[in-house]
Amino acid sequence: MSFNDSNLEGQIGEEMYINYLKDKNIEFFDVREDLQCQWMDIDFIIPSNNHTKEEILKEVKHAKPNTRATRQKEIGYTVEVKLDKVTHNRFKKHNGEITEGTGNLVYELISHNMPGCLARSYADFILYVCVDNFGSETILKKAYMINLYKWRQAMVNTGKYNTQHIVLKPTKYVKENNKLVEENILNILHPVKDLLTVEGAVKDLTDTFMKYFPKNINI
């Protein structure tokens, strides 16, 4: 199986999560094709106590983020899946040394001149899937389930995350209506090791998800 563009790349992590949910007989709504959920950047809804998709989305959209945690067991929660190819990849430097990726999670503030997917997401949790290429096959390196509210709080509350951790990629020019326009991308780089120290912010679920990762793929 070969995934050749960014949309298909993202489906790798989504397929892994679906395999897990089905194997564990966990009820879920696949809302990736739902226009409202695309706008809210939500991929999956895990309901509780027979609540409907509409009931959960209404609460997610209007409830205060700091109250959501107390309601998730009662009504359900939402998940967005993100694929990352740089956090834990292994690459050779010019001198032959092997380096273990960047060690940073990427929080997208601006992408394609719009709010980034994580900046605008209403998801309760981000399944952050880190992959690497091993020979001709793409393999799972790490899978983190991140509480998005606590991730945002960690970035706000920690003095470390100042301008030196905000990376503006070189301006690119894209064609819109036959005119070249600037395309800006703005990210916050957040070290994994720092987020792992924030209570309740992230769980390393690599061992749990390893057997559900799609086989024989190359991106």
Language model features with spans:
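Aromatic- and glycine-enriched beta-alpha-beta binding-site module
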Residues: 106-140
